[in-house]
Structure formats: C-alpha cells, structure tokens
C-alpha cells in the first residue's frame, strides 16, 4: 500500500480492510502516508448462523446457543477429538460457522481494530463493524470516496486527524468495548508510525476507572453483527463522552463533539441490549489489566471482563508446557485437572510470533469438568 501510494503520488486514498492483520497493517500504512488524505472503509463483519433447535447445546458448562459464531468452533474441534457429540452434528457446526463473508462475528482482533480505526477518526461515523452483507456498506464505501475528495480539496491530511488525543480516545473506547488484548501490541505500533509513543502501561492506566459498556461476545452475549444496529462506535462514544477529547477532528471535518450531537438528534441509538449506558455500565474498571510479578516481570495482559470473578484471586498448581500442541494433548487426555494453572512457554512475541492460543481454551471448555471450574 505504501509503495503504491508513493509511486503514484496520491493526494488521498480510501483504505479497505477488515481482519486481524490487514486492519492494523492498513492503519500503520496510513501513519507512514500521513501527508495524504485518508479514509478507512471496513469490509464488514460476518453474520452469526441461527441454529435449528436440535443443534442447540444447553449444558451450562459447554453451551452453544442458537447463534453460532466462529470462536465456538475450537470447542467443537475438541469435542470431535473426544467423541462428545456425533460426527454429523460436528460437521454441521463447521459448515455453518462462517455463513457469510466478513470478519469474525465476535469482538476479537479484527472487530476491535475496526472500532479502533473509527475511534482514531479515520472512518465515517458509525461504519465500523457494518455487517458485510448489509446494503448500507456499499453506500458507506461510496460516501467515503466522496468525503476523501473533500478532504483533499480542503487540505486535511491524515496527520491532522490522528493526534495523541485520538489515541487516548481510542484506548478509552477499547476499555468500553472490552476490546482484544492484541490491541496492546497493534495500537502502539500504529501510534509509532504517526510519531507518538504509547505502551501497555498506558492501557492499564487509562482502563482503571473506565466504564465497560458492550454486551458482545466473548465478554458478552451477542454476536458482533448487532453492534452496528445498536449505534456502533458513536453510541459508545456518546455514552463515554465525559472521558473523551471531544475537540478532535475525524474525517468528517467536524469535531467529534459535533458529530455525536448530530447523531444524538437524529435518534441513531436507543436501546441498551447491546451497548449499555454509561450509568448502567457492565463494569467500571475498564476491560483489560497489565499484570506484573515474578511470572511476568515486564508485564502480561489479561481481559478481566472475560475472566470469572472467582479466578481473580486463586491458588493453583502450575502445569507448564513447551508448546500449545503438548498442552492440548494433555487436556484431551485428562492430564489437566481442576485447580491446575496452564503455562505455555516459547509462544510469546519473541518465540513463535505470539500465535493465538485459541484451541487450548477451546479444549478446556470442551471438558465439562474443567469448564465449570
């Protein structure tokens, strides 16, 4: 992207991305191209699949409700290895877990970074996490093209939009949505390209006392496709505006405060099923914390909103493994018991590049005895 833009001497561009790696990469590219006008358009978020009643699993330890989303497939994969459910049922889940195009339908890295792009001011208001199949997405893309030409005409560059205040706003929105812990790596990298420095401790400091509002999986009940219809990023910012810099300028060319006021007047958001109000927050201490101690002297990150309260203080037996594959095998072979604390070594950013530990958690959830503890 950067090479193409520099080779053709663009005055402005519309940047399209959706997923875990492409969205932060696109935002980093904009940081390097900050002397041109830029708007980001999402490729959209995937739909959830509505399960027929016979495929709903009501076991509280390993529930699969009537809205199937991709993050549940790891659990189903572990069930397959232990023959918990019939093959025909497993095949059905796998076939239907991605029923449409778009980013995964839960608040993982992809959804979080789409929201961060809008919180930084680089998307048109309300367009992050639009459903990939929604007809409004085509209109949003067209509007972005029109707006970027206005930015070019007015001489408004990416560097005029993305400031240190923008990053502080994004971190406050991250707290409100219980965003992915991977943002603690991606946002500092994006900030660096724009000429600013933030670190994990910045997240920890700003999350303290922040209100957590979003009822979206994995820290809530609903698939990510409903976020847009509930008011999206503007609704989160409106509820949280007492903690934001309202004088920043997004790609609309107006201040954030002016944008929120305009949306509030037109009735863009109403109910609280998906996005809670500031006064009725799901929590009031942000959504992640940076933990330091003898296990991680330089720091580690936890999304405490997705962690059972009884695990905040616990005495457990250490069960270390040298790879995720070893760990999954031990879980499936009943070598991990309630009261064990799993440690997987050599899979951090300096080891194997910090891959997702997705299937380990899924294997634990697939064992009712472990999932209920």
Question: What kind of feature is each model-predicted range?
Answer:
Residues 4-26, 38-41:
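A short, small-residue-rich loop immediately preceding and capping a beta-strand
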């Amino acid at each position: 992207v950067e090479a193409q833009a520099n080779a053709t001497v663009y005055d402005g561009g519309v940047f399209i991305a959706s997923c875990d790696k492409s969205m932060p990469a696109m935002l980093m590219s904009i940081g390097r191209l900050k002397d041109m006008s830029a708007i980001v358009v999402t490729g959209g978020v995937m739909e959830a699949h509505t399960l027929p009643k016979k495929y709903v699993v009501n076991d509280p330890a390993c529930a699969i409700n009537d809205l199937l989303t991709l993050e549940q497939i790891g659990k189903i994969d572990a069930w397959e290895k232990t023959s918990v459910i019939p093959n025909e049922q497993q095949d059905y889940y796998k076939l239907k877990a991605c029923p449409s195009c778009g980013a995964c339908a839960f608040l993982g890295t992809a959804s979080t970074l789409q929201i961060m792009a809008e919180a930084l001011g680089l998307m048109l208001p309300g367009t992050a996490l639009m459903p990939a199949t929604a007809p409004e997405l085509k209109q949003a893309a067209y509007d972005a093209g029109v707006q970027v030409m206005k930015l070019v005409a007015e001489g408004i560059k990416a560097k005029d939009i993305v400031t240190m205040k923008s990053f502080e706003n994004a971190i406050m929105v991250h707290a409100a949505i219980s965003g992915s812990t991977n943002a603690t790596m991606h946002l500092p990298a994006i900030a660096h390209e724009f000429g600013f420095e933030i670190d994990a401790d910045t997240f920890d400091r700003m999350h303290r006392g922040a209100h957590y509002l979003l009822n979206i999986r994995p820290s809530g009940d609903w698939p990510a496709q409903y976020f847009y219809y509930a008011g999206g990023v503007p609704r989160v910012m409106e509820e949280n505006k007492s903690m934001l810099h309202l004088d920043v300028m997004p790609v609309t060319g107006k201040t954030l405060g002016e944008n929120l006021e305009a949306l509030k007047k037109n009735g863009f958001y109403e109910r609280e099923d998906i996005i809670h109000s500031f006064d009725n927050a799901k929590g009031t201490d942000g959504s992640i914390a940076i933990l330091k101690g003898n296990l991680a002297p330089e720091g580690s990150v936890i999304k405490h909103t997705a962690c059972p309260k009884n695990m905040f203080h616990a005495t457990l037996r250490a069960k270390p493994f040298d790879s995720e594959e070893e760990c999954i095998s031990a879980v499936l072979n009943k070598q991990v018991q309630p009261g064990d604390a799993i440690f997987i070594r050599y899979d951090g950013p300096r080891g194997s590049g910090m891959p997702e530990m997705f299937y380990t958690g899924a294997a634990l959830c697939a064992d009712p005895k472990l999932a209920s503890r």
